[in-house]
């Protein structure tokens, strides 16, 4: 199974570090299960073992828990646009729909909505309304009722709860 994982890898004023626990732990889990068949087209550099100590020191929490957990990467990140058009991937996952919507129109035009997933791990209960209206599966971490969003009720059939994860290699089994 081929999975295209779309997420940002650039710092901004709004997001000054790369670490995003929901996004990162989901990608770590997918990579653990499916290896190189998961292509993070915008490579999440801080998750890979070659991320430098100097860079690590700039991450939220100094990279504790999620950084440098992927030891190898044989993912083919070339010709992503062409691969989307040719439906090369079985699924397309947006790891943080608020932070990165790269290739979104192309994905929506070429993939069945059942093959697209949006993940919203932000610390608020608000939705990206435009994305919610796309009618794809929308995983939401902070999922609780808000009367200010009652106008979105018809779209809630696509919304599912999601929780944080934890990297398997950080769990002490003994």
Predicted regions and their residues:
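N-terminal pre-catalytic "stem/leader" segment of glycosyltransferase-like enzymes
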Residues: 1-128
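Catalytic core of nucleotide-activated saccharide and alditol-phosphate transferases
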Residues: 91-174
């Amino acid at each position: 199974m081929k999975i295209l994982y779309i997420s940002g890898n650039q710092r901004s004023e709004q997001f000054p570090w790369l670490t995003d626990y929901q996004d990162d732990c989901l990608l770590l889990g997918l990579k653990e299960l499916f290896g190189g068949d998961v292509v993070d087209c915008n490579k999440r550099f801080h998750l890979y073992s070659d991320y430098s100590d100097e860079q690590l020191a700039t991450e939220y929490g100094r990279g504790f828990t999620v950084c440098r957990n992927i030891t190898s990467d044989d993912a083919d990140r070339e010709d992503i646009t062409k691969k989307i058009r040719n439906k090369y991937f079985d699924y397309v996952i947006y790891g943080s729909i608020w932070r990165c919507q790269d290739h979104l129109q192309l994905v929506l035009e070429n993939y069945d909505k059942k093959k697209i997933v949006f993940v919203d791990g932000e610390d608020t209960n608000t939705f990206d309304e435009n994305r919610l209206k796309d009618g794809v599966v929308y995983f939401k971490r902070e999922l609780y009722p808000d009367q200010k969003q009652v106008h979105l009720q018809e779209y809630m059939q696509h919304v599912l709860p999601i929780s944080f994860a934890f990297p398997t290699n950080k769990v002490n089994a003994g």
